Amino acid sequence: MKTSQLFYKTSKNANKEASVLSYELLEKAGYIFKTAKGIYTYTPLFWRVALKMMDIIREELNAIGGQELVLPILHPAELWQKTGRWEAFRSEGLLYTVKDREDKEFCLAPTHEEIVSMFVSQWLSGRKQLPIHLYQIATKFRDEIRPRFGLMRAKEFLMEDSYTFSDSPEQMNEQYAKLRQAYQNIFDRLEIQYVIVEADGGKIGKGKSEEFHVLSSLGEDTLCVSGHYGANIEAAVAQPPQYTYDKDYLPIEEVDTPDVRTIENLQDFFSVPPYRIMKTLVVKLSYGEKEKFTAIGIRGDRQINLTKIGSKLNADACSLASDEEIQKHLGVEKGFIGPLNCPIDFYADETTQCMTNFICAGNVKDKHYKNVNWDRDIPRPEYADFLLAEAGDLCPTNNHAPYEIFEGVEVAHIFNLGTRYTEGFDVVFQDEQGKPQSCWMGTYGIGIGRTLAACIEQLADDRGIVWPKAIAPFDISILYNGGDTACEEAAEKIYKELQGYGYAPLLDDRNERLGFKLKDSDLIGIPYKLILGKTFLNSGMLEIESRSIEKFSVEPKDFVHWCKRHLPSPRVFSPIP
């Protein structure tokens, strides 16, 4: 393509609203246009990049037997009500809903488990059809409370989502492994640094779940990594430092503690380390339109993990209760909540099991108790892992080596769903005995916009975007001083030659000076620049400069050979098997 034909616009100045580098550069280089908060127009330049990434996705998924389809974006409410996710998503305000002229409710799809399950249930004729792998690349919607960071957290976004249906847990795991490897192949071809970590399934499902993260200081997710093992902090199982507690029980004491509310206050007041204090927090659990308040006990030196609590207690959502809610449901101020005489359900983190002679509140203002013990003073609660992992905690999966903490941008997520959706939608087959059995389902997704933004966050430099070669909008830009007839004629000849070999060059034919064109090419992120300037006019040699400032001097007769060595192979869209 020629620049004079390309509908695009670059800008010298950054958008003041662009709070992150990827958002700034995508707007500055003419890849996106903000239509409204969290809603963007994908420009022709952006779509060239997106199509190349989609082509890579299609190649890898078709290679493992994936079949592409297009599912509806508008979903009847009853499908989501059948799985309970209508209430779960609406309770967090994430679901866009509409009504038609017959007053029937629909939602704009944030995900497609329900509708693909209904489809397969109607078409599946027998076990011999299994496993099935269906995928689509489509627009999805989430009414984000705080849309921000450009494509990182938008209200409307582009995703690839895959769904597999199998006849057994073993076959489901085989499909999971195939999709996992296909996703690895996709990100390997993008040549970016990423990690795969264990994750919480959230509202999608409770089975095996992993996330793909591009490492970035922008990352909204915190990752715990130990050797080759990693986990999202929401799901990380960790062994915190262990401490020795008294063997003999001391008499329990009630102590006046006027206005002593925090762990730090208690440490100073009782002259004890924080791990000898039982901290109790109140969480609000949402179950559809219903709410429940529960108390969680944890060592005073640690923090609770709301995701683990919500998962353990099968809640749709979990958050810390407000001061007003605590006062209403417990009749006591924040800071004096404890397991003694607790008027609501009480659970405790498993690291508190060995605590003896600990200090805790008793749900009375300005009072605490010391030398409190399980069984004698408080019935033992149900224990579970409610711990938020920290750097230095030991990783039980990696021979108890310590965790390091990194930040990452989640770009893909894979799940084993089991039979949660297939049972509800009667996605069944007949086994050897002729009995109906529910299929075992998996779901997988890649955020295309998030991945492209994450590439920019990781690879960009002070001159602009640095796209991976495999997805750059053009393979090479051809640049010369506007008005230089000799260079213009040579550029036109090279441009046609490259097109003839199937490459995607961008010929900058604007009547602008060479320096201006060089800056635009770097900003846009084209991997190579072919520069026709003084060197070419004096010696006939072609100057080529990579985006990383690697320079080449090539004779015109060797240029095609150079292209075959350095440019991506001429691309065609992947054939459908």
Swiss-Prot record:
In its UniProt record, a GO molecular function of this protein is: ATP binding
- Matching PROSITE patterns: AA_TRNA_LIGASE_II
EC number from the UniProt entry: 6.1.1.15
Q: List the disulfide bonds.
A: none
Q: Which GO terms describe its cellular component?
A: cytosol
**What is its subcellular localisation?**
Cytoplasm
- Keyword Ion transport assigned to the entry: answer is no
Q: Is Nucleotide-binding set as a keyword in this record?
A: yes
GO BP, one annotated term: prolyl-tRNA aminoacylation
As its record notes, the protein acts as a catalyst of: tRNA(Pro) + L-proline + ATP = L-prolyl-tRNA(Pro) + AMP + diphosphate
Q: Which SUPFAM superfamilies match?
A: Class II aaRS ABD-related, Class II aaRS and biotin synthetases, YbaK/ProRS associated domain
Q: What class of enzyme is it?
A: ligase
Major localisation: cytoplasm
Similarity remark: Belongs to the class-II aminoacyl-tRNA synthetase family. ProS type 1 subfamily.
User: Whom does it interact with, and what assembly results?
Assistant: Homodimer.
Record PANTHER family: MITOCHONDRIAL RIBOSOME PROTEIN L39/PROLYL-TRNA LIGASE FAMILY MEMBER (PTHR42753), PROLINE--TRNA LIGASE (PTHR42753:SF2)
Instruction: Write out the function statement from the record.
Output: Catalyzes the attachment of proline to tRNA(Pro) in a two-step reaction: proline is first activated by ATP to form Pro-AMP and then transferred to the acceptor end of tRNA(Pro). As ProRS can inadvertently accommodate and process non-cognate amino acids such as alanine and cysteine, to avoid such errors it has two additional distinct editing activities against alanine. One activity is designated as 'pretransfer' editing and involves the tRNA(Pro)-independent hydrolysis of activated Ala-AMP.
- Entry domain remark: Consists of three domains: the N-terminal catalytic domain, the editing domain and the C-terminal anticodon-binding domain.
State what protein this is by name.
Proline--tRNA ligase
